[in-house]
Amino acid sequence: MKQICLYFEIHQPVHLKRYRFFEIGKDHYYYDDYENERAIRDTADNSYVPALTTLLEMCKQNDNFKCCFSLSGVAIEMLEQYAPEVIDLLQQIAETGKADFLAEPYSHGLASIGSEESFKNEVARLAGRVKELFGVEPK
């Protein structure tokens, strides 16, 4: 019997607001909270929740089923704030024991280019959050 590994990457980029030249030095808040919330809600409603609901059912119904997730720290923060039901579904999937979680740089950035120490710190930071939220050690 052939085996496959289903790997799911969850990341959400942070949207920056329009920042005009004349705002330099006056406005130091760069994030577009409205667009960030809209984007994560849209993605959660149309992608994450339906897919994770299906994966949870598959985990419960099939003894041989396994899947793997990699979440960026940025995505975790946005999901906790704007779409906590996605975190709840991931926790339920983790509780089945049929999901592995991988570690990556917290910000889903290019930390490995800068320095090995920076890369290790980013990965350790995310690994800590995954353990805290889902009760499993990332691999």
Per-range role (PLM):
Residues M1-P138:
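Catalytic alpha-helical scaffold of carbohydrate-active enzymes acting on polysaccharides/glycoconjugates
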